Amino acid sequence: MLDKVKNVIVVLSGKGGVGKSTVSTQLALALRATGHKVGLLDIDLCGPSVPYLLGLEGRDIFQCDDGWVPIYTDESKTLAVMSIGFLLKNRTDPVIWRGPKKTMMIKQFLSDVKWDELDYLIIDTPPGTSDEHITVMECLREVPCNGAIIVTTPQGVALDDVRKEITFCKKTGIKLLGIVENMSGFVCPHCTECTNIFSSNGGAELANLAQVPHLGTLPIDPRVGVLAGSTASALDELPDSSTAQILRGIVQHLDALTAVPAIA
């Protein structure tokens, strides 16, 4: 049930291992840190990592008359989370389903979860372009979807896959809000100097080629890695870091597009 959701943002990646779920969770936490009510929906059915990234593993989902009740990270209910990871007995249990069963589960996630009033719903998708993505886009035709953010890394193979994602967005009619280049450079935990370990600026060049905003370049920062397994936002814990600055910029970009003012 998305009738109380003001804005829907889909997060995509061309391939796995680019840090898409980390970006999704930190974006959701950044939106919450700036005064928004946020929902985070993890539809990566075969590799759900959002419960782990937020330290919510082992939490149980309950049903009410209106559907599934998402997991809330705090008493004020400013961040609600839903993932198939909450429905599995063990984190290591594989989800071995064919396409139709995956499609049915995603439709349930989009129609049978009792979201309260949300400023933003962030949908973390599996990598690539598959049945899951097509199902999401079909379901969101009845609900205003603001668009998609693509996460990539500087390597050439990742950038090649992003081109496929851009084509996918065009063919499915979803607006591309921008590209985030992740894992670009390594931040020394001692002096905080950032050193490029892969090629750089690939995300910016691709955004320019596709004529969409380049939302920022996120480095590999061990200090941000320490935040995994908690609901701590880089904006609160590392306010002066480049990661926090980029996330703050993305939040401002989304607020400008959606006309939803931040409180903080």
From Swiss-Prot:
CDD domains: Mrp_NBP35. Gene3D superfamilies: P-loop containing nucleotide triphosphate hydrolases (3.40.50.300). ATP binds at residues 14-21. GO terms for biological process: iron-sulfur cluster assembly. GO terms for cellular component: cytosol. It comes from Drosophila grimshawi (Hawaiian fruit fly). One of its GO terms (molecular function) is ATP-dependent FeS chaperone activity. Keywords: 4Fe-4S, ATP-binding, Cytoplasm, Iron, Iron-sulfur, Metal-binding, Nucleotide-binding. [4Fe-4S] cluster binds at residues 188, 191. Component of the cytosolic iron-sulfur (Fe/S) protein assembly (CIA) machinery. Required for maturation of extramitochondrial Fe-S proteins. The Nubp1-Nubp2 heterotetramer forms a Fe-S scaffold complex, mediating the de novo assembly of an Fe-S cluster and its transfer to target apoproteins. Binds 4 [4Fe-4S] clusters per heterotetramer. Contains two stable clusters in the N-termini of Nubp1 and two labile, bridging clusters between subunits of the Nubp1-Nubp2 heterotetramer. The gene is Nubp2. The keyword Amino-acid biosynthesis does not apply. This is Cytosolic Fe-S cluster assembly factor Nubp2 homolog. Its main location: cytoplasm. Belongs to the Mrp/NBP35 ATP-binding proteins family. NUBP2/CFD1 subfamily. The lineage of its organism: Eukaryota, Metazoa, Ecdysozoa, Arthropoda, Hexapoda. Heterotetramer of 2 Nubp1 and 2 Nubp2 chains. It holds the Pfam family ParA. The keyword Iron-sulfur applies. It is found in: Cytoplasm. Its cofactor is [4Fe-4S] cluster.
